[in-house]
Curated annotation (Swiss-Prot):
This is Cysteine proteinase inhibitor 12. It is found in: Secreted. InterPro entries: Cystatin, Cystatin_dom, Cystatin_sf, Prot_inh_cystat_CS. It comes from the Eukaryota. It comes from Oryza sativa subsp. japonica (Rice). GO terms for biological process: defense response. The keyword ATP-binding does not apply. Residues 1-32 form the signal peptide. The keyword Repeat applies.
Length: 250
């Protein structure tokens, strides 16, 4: 009887490490799941933040190649005959790879139009796919060649032009640079949106009246600018003023 009583504690102590091991395993698994979940949330937050500007990529060989790929893929899918001209704007969004948001010019039956395309790239898989391709309107081509012809072709006065037009974007970029040069702020101005744009051809230059939404630090502001473009293609900021409304004063 005494011998049997002395053997029971031994068997109990031998089984004790098993629950401890299980607890450690469960704790490790929970920690791993937490880390994975945190990483997923971080990635989701980055994606939800939207695409960010990639100004240096707008004129790069790689971006041109992506834009040509987008045009070629669209032509194949729609049996179209678009001809790539140039990249106007390039943005990037981090997903499982990179989603390139491209604004580009292409010719359709000799007429220049503006398109927005999204190209998904996974470099490690040599994967590239056109996600979206859509027309945003005709390009307003105030070029050296046709500026003179348009002087007599348009009725006098301002007329609305597409905010995505490449020349309007160039005029807005010039205005932002000029505003930045005149500012003593430590924070640079960033163009968020062209809200409205008008154009008028007068004598030997084109005038652009542009309402822009800019960001400086954490503050958003609206500016109205008049930019002139001469026959040589040079932009000059003629005048600008800050617009005050409820959204910009907050």
């Amino acid at each position: 009887m005494r011998v049997a009583a002395t053997t029971r504690p031994a068997s109990s102590s031998a089984a004790a490490p098993l629950p401890l091991f299980l607890l450690l395993a469960v704790a490790a698994a929970a920690a791993a799941l937490f880390l994975v979940g945190s990483a997923s949330l971080a990635m989701a937050g980055h994606v939800l933040g939207g695409a960010h500007d990639a100004p240096s990529a707008a004129n790069s060989v790689e971006t041109d190649a992506l834009a040509r790929f987008a045009v070629d893929e669209h032509n194949k899918r729609e049996n179209a005959l678009l001809e790539f001209v140039r990249v106007v704007e390039a943005k990037e969004q981090v997903v499982a790879g990179t989603l390139h948001h491209l604004t580009l010019e292409a010719l359709e039956a000799g007429r220049k139009k503006v398109y927005e395309a999204k190209v998904w790239v996974k470099p490690w898989l040599d994967f590239k796919e056109l996600q979206e391709f859509r027309n945003t309107g005709d390009a307003t081509t105030f070029t050296n060649a046709d500026l003179g012809a348009k002087k007599g072709g348009h009725e006098p006065g301002w007329r609305d032009v597409p905010v995505h037009d490449p020349v309007v974007k160039d005029a807005a970029d010039h205005a932002v640079k000029s505003i930045q040069q005149r500012s003593n702020s430590l924070f640079p101005y960033e163009l968020l949106e062209i809200v409205r744009a008008k154009a008028e051809v007068v004598e030997d230059f084109a005038k652009f009246d542009i309402l822009m939404k800019l960001k400086r630090g954490n503050k958003e502001e609206k500016f109205k600018a008049e930019v002139h473009k001469n026959l040589e293609g040079a932009f000059v900021l003629n005048q600008m003023q800050q617009e005050h409304d409820e959204s910009s004063s907050q």
